[in-house]
């Protein structure tokens, strides 16, 4: 791997100059906050444990701050960008600041939620500063669509990071926690201050690490069947599962039968259950 140019990464002045040249103003609609600190993006790459043979997919690369740091460490990087102006500019930024690695970069101009395939080798890692307003749907979509993604590190709103990494019994344990755990072991991997972004957001950010399960969850129920139970259980999270799952099962009595068959108390609440227990409930639906 060739050595990167010492000043290849973007600093605060670089980000603002690029944005000004492109006429870009970060929009809340797309949850855009650009990282302006080179040390932060290198820390993200280190925490993600990006390897020289990794094929990394990045969602929402923006002006390219994290993209360039990923290109220093990975074999290939594919970035998915929805914004017309940003997607048009990023290949030129990569070519100008890291010419020796430009042939290792690919840009997909698309909404990440619509991406079903990527150019080149299948991705082995997902590393991204996810737009805050779509972070969870995009994360779950990418994990589902690209089973070769073994390791993921995403930067999201701190509150979302807490939810994703929460375990049963936590007040913030919910649908994102369970669905992420269907695919991977999930944990918090650090915090990011507001001052490394432009513009500075009104909320703190957190890093979340996801390591894909070495074997899929053992269940005869499909993912859709399990997720239907999860959605029903948390739609009325204060209710007992017997009541919350009545609509899903067809009646409270049918819900109770499925719960008892799964070895789960009908008086329990969704926030107390593991993804394995939700799967067992799905298996016992009559």
UniProtKB/Swiss-Prot annotation:
Gene3D superfamilies: Ribosomal RNA adenine dimethylase-like, domain 2 (1.10.8.100), Vaccinia Virus protein VP39 (3.40.50.150)
Keywords tagged on the record: Cytoplasm, Methyltransferase, RNA-binding, rRNA processing, S-adenosyl-L-methionine, Transferase
GO MF: 16S rRNA (adenine(1518)-N(6)/adenine(1519)-N(6))-dimethyltransferase activity; RNA binding; rRNA (adenine-N6,N6-)-dimethyltransferase activity
Binding residues annotated for S-adenosyl-L-methionine, in chain numbering: 33, 35, 60, 81, 111, 129
Any one annotated GO CC term: cytosol
Subcellular location: Cytoplasm
Main location: cytoplasm
EC number of this enzyme: 2.1.1.182
Catalytic function, reaction form: adenosine(1518)/adenosine(1519) in 16S rRNA + 4 S-adenosyl-L-methionine = N(6)-dimethyladenosine(1518)/N(6)-dimethyladenosine(1519) in 16S rRNA + 4 S-adenosyl-L-homocysteine + 4 H(+)
SUPFAM superfamilies: S-adenosyl-L-methionine-dependent methyltransferases
Domain of life: Bacteria
GO process annotations (BP): rRNA methylation
Cited HAMAP family: 16SrRNA_methyltr_A
NCBIfam families: ksgA
Role: Specifically dimethylates two adjacent adenosines (A1518 and A1519) in the loop of a conserved hairpin near the 3'-end of 16S rRNA in the 30S particle. May play a critical role in biogenesis of 30S subunits.
UniProt protein name: Ribosomal RNA small subunit methyltransferase A
Organism classification: Bacteria, Bacillati, Actinomycetota, Actinomycetes, Kitasatosporales
């Amino acid at each position: 791997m060739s050595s990167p140019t010492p000043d290849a990464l973007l600093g605060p002045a670089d980000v603002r100059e690029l944005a000004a040249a492109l006429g870009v103003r970060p929009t809340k609609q797309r949850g855009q906050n650009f990282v302006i600190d080179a040390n932060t993006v290198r820390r993200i790459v280190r925490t993600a444990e990006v390897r020289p043979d990794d094929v990394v997919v990045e969602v929402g690369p923006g002006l390219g701050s994290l993209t360039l740091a990923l290109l220093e460490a990975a074999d290939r990087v594919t970035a998915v960008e929805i914004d017309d102006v940003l997607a048009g500019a990023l290949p030129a930024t990569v070519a100008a600041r890291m010419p020796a690695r430009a042939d290792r970069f690919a840009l997909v101009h698309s909404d990440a939620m619509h991406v079903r395939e990527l150019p080149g080798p299948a991705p082995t890692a997902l590393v991204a500063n996810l737009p805050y307003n779509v972070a969870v749907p995009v994360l779950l979509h990418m994990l589902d669509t690209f089973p070769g993604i073994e390791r993921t590190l995403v930067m999201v709103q701190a509150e979302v990071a807490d939810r994703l990494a929460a375990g049963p019994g936590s007040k913030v344990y919910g649908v994102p926690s369970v669905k992420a755990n269907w695919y991977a072991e999930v944990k918090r991997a650090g915090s990011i201050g507001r001052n490394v972004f432009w513009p500075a957001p009104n909320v703190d950010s957190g890093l979340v690490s996801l390591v894909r399960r070495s074997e899929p969850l053992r269940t005869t129920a499909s993912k859709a069947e399990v997720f239907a139970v999860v959605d029903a259980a948390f739609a009325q999270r204060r209710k007992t599962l017997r009541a919350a799952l009545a609509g899903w099962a067809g009646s409270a009595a049918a819900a109770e039968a499925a719960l008892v068959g799964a070895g789960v108390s009908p008086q329990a609440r969704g926030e107390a259950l593991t993804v394995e227990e939700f799967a067992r409930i799905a298996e016992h639906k009559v």
